[in-house]
Every structure is written in structure tokens, then in C-alpha cells.
């Protein structure tokens, strides 16, 4: 029968862990009682088979937890014993070491004390010195008194050898050891009287004779002098504050009644900062040195000053190291300056050589599209122009050096490309080798001159080593002189005579031969230009030389050349190129068919009511006749075929020509014989090489009757074959008609399908045709307004020369009465994101200084039509009214300027003003064009 029931066992198990922890805290007796109780419960659990499984599991879990706690406690106790033993051992070892060191110190002190006895006069003299630090200069009577005291302390034999000079010498040495003379020279300029006055203020006065302990650093606050005793040069900056605000608990208050103690004035206010801080600290340091001279009791500043003081030996080493580093840095700086001087001299010589090279260059050729893509970046061009500017500023006093046009050919800008010429390879190699010899001789002369001027041979050796420093980058090529270690003294002096270079020979360029007379002869068929094309047999040699100019002058001349119209009479060569025009070079590595990029921004998904605005650069070398009023107007119709895209087609009006022709210009040689040419497609300006589409352009010399017949037949055949239902034609402004600037049929089924959702590029296109791009302005109108780019080469080798102006490049020339002016407006609007800032050429500072241009009083209806059609983005939101401050007269002007900068587009007034200015400029250009045409018609 068990001693405990199942309920008692379960209850005890629930409280077993708490009772165990309590027993651990109480001690060994409580643990013994818990152990006995645990044994009895354990026996009952083992003997009673009727206990449920939950009670057995609980007893097992409680036993495991108690066992783990007991194990942890045992480990902790063992660790504590180990730590206690280690600490005891360390403590005993430290005590033993301390005892041994103390014994050694005692032995050393005893040996020092018993080595040599001190002279008998040192003790009385030293005691007097310590008590009279305010005036360590004893009088003769005091010296005799100290001498008598010393004789009384020693034997008669030693006393008879003592003299007054021994005491004088000791005081001199004592003042030097405690730093008296150093402080007097450093702080008082060697004045003994000023130093004595400071020491009296520090430690006492002449009237009071007291022991030094009464006036030490810790007790000298009660002996402060009055204000009138302090000299002006010894007063502190805090002296006035100390006199005005005395402490409340000052011992110098005259108190008559305890109730009125706080209201009384001090009888003699004292100064609490009579000396300057640096003087006071120096005197305190002097006191410390005096107290430590013979090992007496250390003062309160002894430990702190000793710990902060720096040993003289270490201070000397640091000073020597600092001086050595300073000398090394100075020498390195001098070597760097000499290297920079030699480098600058070499750069000047290179600049002079480049200037001589540019003088013999011929006239540049225009770049092709392939070569333009392979030119240098803008950063290289900027560096090139910067070097040119630097070379122009230098004096041309150098000798004529050799020219290397092959090295400088890659540095030419895209606008000025050196004409290709042929030279013998052997001559080029000789010139290159001569130029290398010149560079080497120049470097050697520089080194020789430096070795003569520099007297320090070691410095010269280090300089030569650093001048030809080997490359440290892995994989880099090593110089040819890297392994040579020859000192400058071992080099043999070489004397070079100045090299005599021949003047560069003139470069001759072969140009096309002049064409036969345009009257009475028919021009030959144009031949497509190619890099392998042979030159005519009869070629004229032309001496061409064109010096390079600065970047600013070059841009200004190019701008003026683009604005100025060409001369009216232009003679054409047999190959269709104007005489005097140098053929463009094409890259042999990349061969791509000529194409022209044209942008067709659409304001919406469908065809706008105002027509399609065509921008870009169709071809600046093609001259479209602005007087071709007989051409057929074109209409656009739109038919939405699917949600994926829209189809835009150009459909002719009934009875008009479907084939778009181009009338020859006044300067084209083909204008005199346009009726003699036949309408064949084989001699078209562009050849079609695509197998998918075989579309060619009609000949430009087709007569009006043939054009009408062809257009009628084409339109009738197209109407019969097309079964799609089209929308009624929309009237289009003539300036937006693509038929007026291109003689190609921009039919979407043939030339490509337009996708307004993503790009805006056609899916299928003939490579040699125009590259048409359509943009949806409703999605992102600001992204598609980009500046037009001039094509660097001709799109057609047989095209007529330029008669349009630079501003009208890429615009649409309309056959209307004001066609040129409207095309001018269209071109300017397409050159920038903001119409008001499209043609600005001045800086903001110049615009502020320059008076504003007067606004056109009555702009034409064309300006209002452009603003209302949505071609130019303007700011529709009216600015909020603001009241200008009285003191700021230009507040409104600055506010308007800030608003214009924050807005992506200009205001309507700004755009209207700019359009009016463009309209006036277009009218002026139109009048000039008409005058040129009249001059050309009369022959000069």
C-alpha cells in the first residue's frame, strides 16, 4: 500500500520544481529534506500500478527538469572554485613581485646615498631658495650667513676650504636648472625687473617675509595684490570682470550685521586674475622644478607635469624626422616643377608643329553618312579645339618642323574633313622617323641642360629615375629604355645641330573636269557615285590649301554660309555634280543604301483636319522649285482597319496626276533641256534593289501632258481595283502636302504600314526609299519635337544644287503665293521643344541687356491658324495675379521668367511674338529669293 494517494502525488509533482529552487536557496539542510521527500514519492510511483499515464509522464518530466537544474548548479560551482583558485594565485604572485622590487629599490637608494656626500652648503642654500622663489638673488649678507651655516655643519678641515664663490656658483646653477633664465628670456624679453615683479605677484610681496609654504600654489589666494599694484602689461583680460563681480563669500567683506551682510560693499576689492595664464603657468612650472631639484616633497602639480612632459630625446628625434620629411617634400616638388616645365615646352613645340601642318591642308570635303557615324565623340572634339586655341595663343617663333597629316587626320571635326590625298609611303616613314629623332634630341638636350644647372648629383639621379617611370599596370607595354640603367654622369655629351627641315610641298587634288556648254548639248545620264568610281581621264589639278580656324569662327562661318543663298548661275559637270564640288568619301567598311529620315507627327490616331506636319531633313541638296504652281494638290484620306494601327494613304484628286514630279530649279542644268529627256524609270535618281517592291520614280523631265495622262490612267485603274470604301477627301493646307517636297508616292501599302501605338516606324519599307516615321503627339507631344539635322552628303548624286536657305531645310515648300514663308514657319516650329526658344542664339545675360524686340502690330492670319491648329504647344493656363513689392521694380519680370522656366512650353503671347518675327523673316527671304530668280532669268 502506497504512502501517498494519486491526488497527493499529482499535487506534489506540480510544486516540486518550486520546492527544489527554495531548497537551493535555503542551504544543505533543505536540500536533504527535499531529497528524502523525492525518494518517497518516487517509491510510491514505482509501486502503484494504478496510476494514470499522465501522472507517470508528469513525474518523468519533473525529474528531468530537476536533474538539469542540479547539473547546471554543479557546473557553476566547479567554475567558481576554478576562478577563485586562479585569482588567489595571481594575487600571491603580484605580492611577491612587489616585495622583490621594493627590496631592490631600497638597496639602490642606499647605495646612492652612501656613494658621495653632498657639499655642506647645499642644504642651507636650497632651503633659502625654496622659501624665496619670488627673488632668488640673495644679497652678500645672506650669502655670508649661509656660508657660516655650512661651516657649522662640517668639520674644520672641510670648512676652511669653503668660500663665498661656491655659494654664488651654486645659485647660478640652481636658477638655470629650475628654468629661471629660460622664462625670463621667453616671456619677459630678458628683463630681470619684470620677472621679479611677476614672481612677487605670484608668491608674495617684498614687505612680508614668510615661509614658502604660506605662499605656495594651494594657499596663495589670500595674498592677492590690489589693482593699482598690477602693471598694464601683466594684467589679464578677465581683470575687469573680476573687480566688478566679487564673490559672495569673499573674506574681505566688512560685515557689521548678519542681517545686512549681503548688501555690504567690500572694503578693498582684490584681483583674482592678476597675471596672464601663460605667465602663471610658467611660474608654477618653475616652482615644480625647484621642489624636485633635490628630491624633497613633490608639489600638487608634480605628477601631472611629469606625465605630460616629453623627453628631450624623443622631441629631438621627431624634429629631425620632420625636417627630413620637409626637405624630401621640397625636393619632390622641385622635381615635379621641372618635369612640368619640360612637358609644357614639348606641348608648345607640338602645337607649333600642328599649326604648320594645318597651313598646308587643302579644302575639306563633305562627310558621308557612314563617315559621320564613325567620327570622334564631342569630348574628343572639345579637346582638339582646346589644343588648337592653346597653340594659336603661343608665339610662332619655332623652327619649321615636320608635318604628319596621318596622325592629325583623325582629329579633324565633322564640318572640316581633310581631303584625301596620296603620298609616297617611303617619304612618310622618313618624316616620321625624323620627327621621332627630333623628339629624342629635344629630350636629351633638356636633360643635359638640367644636369648642368643642378649642382646636386643625387637629386639629378632621382629626377631621371622618376622621369622615365616604368608602367605599373599589368599587361601594359614597356618602354624601350625601361631596362637601361645609365646614370646621367656616364652619358657622353652630344652636340646636335638644329635640324633643317624642307618646307612641305603643296598637295594637289584632282577635281572633276568642267562640263560642256549647257546650251546645245544634252547632259549625260547620271552615274551613281561609289568609292570605286574612276576619275575622268581629263582632270584639272587644283592647288588647295585651307588653314584650320578656331571653333567659334568656324561655326559662325558655317552659319553664315547656310543663311546666304548660292550664286544663281551654277555650271554642272558631266556626272550631274556642280563644278567645284569635291566628291564625298564613303567608308569601304560599311555600305548602306542612302535613305532620308522624315518625321510625320500625328496629333491624334486619325488624320487631323489640318493635315500632316512633315519635319526632318528630306535632303538639303535637292532643290525643289518653289514656283511649281501647276502641280496637282494632294488629299489624304484615313481608313481605320484595325485597333493595332491605322492606314494613311495619299490619294490624288480626280483628273490629277498620281505621279509626283519635281520641277527643276533655276540653277539646274537640266532645266534648259527638260523637254529632251525621256520618261524612263531606268535613269531615276534612286535605284530600287528590293525584291519585295519594285517602285521607281518617274523622270523629272516628264511633260505636263504625259503627267496628266499617267495620273488619269493610274487613278482610274486604282479606283477599279480598290474595293474598299473610303471616306470623303479632306482638304489639306498646301504646306503640309508631302507631294510638294517628295516625288515619291507615299502609299502605305507600298511604302509601309503606320503603327500609331508603339513606333512609329513602318513595318515594311523599301531600303532605298524615304524612311518615314509617324509619331502620335497626343501621347507625348514634347518628345517628337527635335531639331532638324542637315545631311552631310547628297541623297542623290544627280540632284540640283541648293537654292533653299538653312532655316528652310527640311520644311515643306508650297506652290502657293506665300509658299516659302509658310515653309519657313513650319521648319522653325520643328526645331525645338519650345517655339519661343527655337532660334535663340544669345545668352541669358545678353537677352537681359538687349532691349526687347517690338511686337508685330498686326500678325497675319497664318500665325493665329498655327496657334489654333495645335502645331505649337503653348501654355493655356493664365498666371495668377501677383502684386509687386514697392522696393522691387523688376519683380514681375523675374516672376514671368521663373514661370517660363518651370513650364515645359511657352505662353501664347511668347509664341505669337516669335511666329510674327519668323513671318517677317520669311517675307524678307521670299523677296530676296524672287530678286535672285529675276537675276538668274536675265543671265546675271
UniProtKB/Swiss-Prot annotation:
Cellular localization per UniProt: Nucleus
PANTHER family referenced in this protein's UniProt entry, alphabetically: AGL056WP, FI24008P1
DNA-binding region(s) in UniProt: 110-182
Biased amino acid composition, Basic and acidic residues: 337-360, 877-896
UniProt similarity note: Belongs to the TALE/M-ATYP homeobox family.
Biased segments, Low complexity type: 516-531, 582-611, 657-693, 704-724
Compositionally biased region (Acidic residues): 376-400, 427-469, 694-703
Molecular function per GO: DNA binding
A Pfam family this chain is assigned to: Mating_N
Residue ranges, annotated region (Disordered): 333-618, 633-762, 832-863, 877-912
Assigned keywords, A-Z: DNA-binding, Homeobox, Nucleus, Transcription, Transcription regulation
Keyword DNA-binding set for record: yes
Highest taxon, organism lineage: Eukaryota
Role this protein plays: Specifies A-alpha-4 mating-type. May regulate the expression of genes specific to the homokaryotic cell type.
Transmembrane regions: none
Protein name: Mating-type protein A-alpha Z4
Swiss-Prot/TrEMBL GO biological process terms: regulation of DNA-templated transcription
GO cellular component terms, semicolon-separated: nucleus
Amino acid at each position: 500500500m502506497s504512502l501517498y494517494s494519486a491526488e497527493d502525488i499529482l499535487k506534489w509533482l506540480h510544486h516540486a520544481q518550486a520546492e527544489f529552487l527554495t531548497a537551493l536557496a535555503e542551504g544543505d539542510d533543505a536540500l536533504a529534506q527535499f531529497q528524502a521527500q523525492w525518494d518517497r514519492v518516487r517509491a510510491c510511483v514505482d509501486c502503484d500500478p494504478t496510476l494514470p499515464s499522465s501522472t507517470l509522464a508528469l513525474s518523468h518530466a519533473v525529474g528531468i527538469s530537476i536533474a538539469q537544474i542540479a547539473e547546471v548548479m554543479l557546473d557553476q560551482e566547479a567554475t567558481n572554485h576554478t576562478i577563485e583558485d586562479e585569482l588567489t594565485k595571481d594575487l600571491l604572485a603580484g605580492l611577491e613581485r612587489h616585495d622583490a622590487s621594493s627590496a631592490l629599490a631600497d638597496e639602490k637608494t642606499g647605495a646612492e646615498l652612501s656613494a658621495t656626500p653632498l657639499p655642506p652648503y647645499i642644504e642651507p642654500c636650497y632651503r633659502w631658495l625654496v622659501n624665496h622663489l619670488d627673488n632668488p638673488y640673495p644679497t652678500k649678507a645672506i650669502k655670508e650667513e649661509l656660508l657660516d651655516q655650512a661651516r657649522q655643519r662640517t668639520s674644520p678641515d672641510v670648512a676652511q676650504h669653503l668660500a663665498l664663490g661656491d655659494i654664488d656658483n651654486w645659485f647660478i646653477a640652481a636658477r638655470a636648472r629650475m628654468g629661471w633664465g629660460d622664462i625670463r628670456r621667453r616671456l619677459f624679453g630678458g628683463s630681470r625687473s619684470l620677472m621679479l615683479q611677476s614672481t612677487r605677484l605670484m608668491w608674495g610681496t617684498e614687505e612680508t617675509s614668510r615661509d614658502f609654504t604660506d605662499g605656495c600654489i594651494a594657499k596663495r589666494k589670500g595674498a592677492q595684490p590690489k589693482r593699482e599694484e598690477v602693471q598694464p602689461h601683466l594684467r589679464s583680460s578677465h581683470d575687469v570682470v573680476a573687480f566688478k563681480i566679487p564673490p559672495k563669500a569673499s573674506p574681505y567683506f566688512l560685515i557689521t550685521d548678519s542681517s545686512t551682510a549681503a548688501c555690504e560693499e567690500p572694503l578693498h576689492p582684490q584681483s583674482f586674475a592678476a597675471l596672464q595664464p601663460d605667465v602663471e603657468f610658467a611660474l608654477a612650472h618653475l616652482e615644480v622644478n625647484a621642489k624636485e631639484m633635490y628630491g624633497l616633497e613633490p608639489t600638487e602639480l608634480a605628477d601631472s607635469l611629469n606625465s605630460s612632459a616629453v623627453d628631450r630625446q624623443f622631441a629631438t628625434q621627431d624634429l629631425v624626422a620632420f625636417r627630413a620629411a620637409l626637405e624630401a617634400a621640397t625636393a619632390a616638388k622641385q622635381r615635379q616643377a621641372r618635369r612640368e616645365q619640360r612637358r609644357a615646352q614639348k606641348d608648345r613645340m607640338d602645337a607649333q608643329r600642328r599649326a604648320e601642318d594645318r597651313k598646308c591642308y587643302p579644302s575639306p570635303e563633305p562627310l558621308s553618312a557612314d563617315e559621320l557615324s564613325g567620327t570622334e565623340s564631342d569630348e574628343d572634339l572639345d579637346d582638339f579645339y582646346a589644343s588648337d586655341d592653346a597653340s594659336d595663343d603661343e608665339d610662332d617663333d619655332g623652327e619649321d618642323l615636320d608635318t604628319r597629316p596621318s596622325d592629325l587626320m583623325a582629329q579633324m571635326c565633322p564640318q572640316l574633313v581633310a581631303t584625301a590625298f596620296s603620298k609616297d609611303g617611303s617619304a612618310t616613314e622618313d618624316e616620321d622617323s625624323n620627327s621621332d629623332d627630333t623628339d629624342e634630341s629635344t629630350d636629351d638636350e633638356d636633360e643635359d641642360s638640367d644636369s648642368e644647372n643642378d649642382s646636386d648629383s643625387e637629386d639629378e639621379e632621382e629626377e631621371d629615375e622618376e622621369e622615365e617611370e616604368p608602367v605599373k599596370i599589368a599587361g601594359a607595354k614597356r618602354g624601350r629604355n625601361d631596362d637601361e640603367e645609365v646614370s646621367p654622369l656616364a652619358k657622353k655629351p652630344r652636340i646636335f645641330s638644329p635640324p633643317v627641315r624642307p618646307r612641305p610641298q603643296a598637295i594637289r587634288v584632282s577635281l572633276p573636269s568642267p562640263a560642256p556648254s549647257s546650251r546645245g548639248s544634252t547632259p549625260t545620264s547620271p552615274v551613281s557615285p561609289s568609292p570605286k568610281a574612276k576619275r575622268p581621264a581629263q582632270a584639272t589639278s587644283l592647288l588647295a590649301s585651307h588653314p584650320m580656324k578656331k571653333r567659334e569662327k568656324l561655326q559662325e562661318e558655317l552659319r553664315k554660309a547656310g543663311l546666304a543663298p548660292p550664286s544663281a548661275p551654277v555650271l554642272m559637270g558631266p556626272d550631274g555634280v556642280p563644278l567645284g564640288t569635291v566628291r564625298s568619301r564613303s567608308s569601304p567598311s560599311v555600305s548602306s543604301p542612302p535613305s532620308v529620315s522624315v518625321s510625320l507627327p500625328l496629333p491624334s490616331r486619325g488624320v487631323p483636319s489640318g493635315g500632316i506636319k512633315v519635319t526632318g531633313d528630306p535632303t538639303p541638296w535637292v532643290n525643289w522649285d518653289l514656283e511649281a504652281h501647276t502641280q496637282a494638290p494632294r488629299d489624304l484620306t484615313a481608313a481605320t482597319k484595325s485597333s493595332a494601327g491605322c492606314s494613311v494613304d495619299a490619294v490624288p484628286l480626280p483628273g490629277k496626276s498620281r505621279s509626283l514630279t519635281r520641277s527643276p530649279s533655276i540653277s539646274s542644268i537640266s532645266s534648259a533641256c527638260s523637254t529632251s529627256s525621256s520618261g524612263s524609270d531606268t535613269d531615276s535618281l534612286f535605284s530600287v534593289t528590293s525584291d519585295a517592291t519594285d517602285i521607281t520614280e518617274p523622270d523629272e523631265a516628264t511633260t505636263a501632258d504625259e503627267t496628266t495622262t499617267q495620273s488619269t490612267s493610274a487613278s482610274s485603274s486604282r479606283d477599279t481595283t480598290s474595293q474598299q470604301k473610303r471616306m470623303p477627301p479632306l482638304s489639306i493646307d498646301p504646306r503640309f502636302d508631302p507631294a510638294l517636297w517628295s516625288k515619291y508616292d507615299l502609299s502605305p501599302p507600298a511604302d509601309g504600314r503606320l503603327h500609331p501605338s508603339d513606333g512609329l516606324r513602318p513595318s515594311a519599307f523599301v531600303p532605298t526609299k524615304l524612311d518615314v516615321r509617324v509619331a502620335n503627339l497626343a501621347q507625348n507631344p514634347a518628345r517628337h519635337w527635335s531639331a532638324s539635322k542637315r545631311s552631310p552628303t547628297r541623297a542623290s548624286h544627280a540632284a540640283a544644287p541648293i537654292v533653299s536657305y538653312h532655316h528652310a531645310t527640311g520644311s515643306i515648300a508650297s506652290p502657293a503665293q506665300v509658299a516659302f514663308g509658310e515653309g519657313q514657319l513650319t521648319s522653325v516650329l520643328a526645331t525645338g521643344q519650345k517655339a519661343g526658344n527655337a532660334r535663340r542664339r544669345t545668352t541669358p545675360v545678353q537677352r537681359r541687356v538687349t532691349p526687347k524686340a517690338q511686337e508685330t502690330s498686326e500678325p497675319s492670319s497664318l500665325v493665329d491658324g498655327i496657334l489654333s491648329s495645335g502645331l505649337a504647344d503653348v501654355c493655356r493656363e493664365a498666371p495668377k495675379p501677383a502684386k509687386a513689392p514697392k522696393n522691387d521694380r523688376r519683380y514681375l519680370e523675374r516672376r514671368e521668367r521663373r514661370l517660363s522656366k518651370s513650364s515645359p512650353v511657352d505662353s501664347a503671347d511668347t509664341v505669337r511674338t516669335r511666329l510674327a518675327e519668323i513671318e517677317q523673316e520669311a517675307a524678307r527671304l521670299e523677296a530676296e529669293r524672287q530678286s535672285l530668280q529675276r537675276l538668274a532669268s536675265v543671265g546675271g
